[in-house]
Amino acid sequence: MKSIYFKILILAFMASSLYSYAWGLTGHRVIADIAENHLSRKARREIKKMMGRERLAYWANWPDFIKSDTTGAWKQASSWHYVNIDPQTDFKAFEQNLKAQAGPSLYTQVNTLSSQIKDKNTSEKDRKIALIFLIHIMGDLAQPLHVGRAEDLGGNKINVTYFGEKTNLHSVWDGKLVDSQNTATQNILSF
């Protein structure tokens, strides 16, 4: 059964990426807040039933936090945070490349997670986890270095100096841009 509120959630996340300049902790929370601010009443009710009283921003970083889990319980989700593409690829070649890749990616998981959330036969716990991941990976999908070349590991192999600090391009884009502004989340949301 297709539900309009999930379509609205996905559209809100996609729209939020237009206003997002970085992702890290602050960026993921801001993206989730922007998406939540654009939900219909029906979508908001349905998500509240599933998630409880916490805002979407509360859960937005959980998929990054569990990457450090040493039990291996979430190992299969590590590839959900990015997709490798050749920058000279058109969409048709991109789709063929995805089919040739082993395992899921950020791009393929959007549909998989959306289907799990909509499937009433999926347990409430699994639907909640799918929504938490969807909240997070929609932000990752909008971050240019999570959709890029495998050779530079999403900018992790590109060394830069940012305000006198040696770091890498991914780190700058993922958090330092927003965090260095010392701007309250509320101010970011008003852009």
Spans of features found by a protein language model:
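Bacterial N-terminal signal peptides that target proteins for export
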Residues: M1-I8
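Sec-dependent N-terminal signal peptides of Gram-positive bacterial secreted proteins and lipoproteins
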Residues: F13-M14
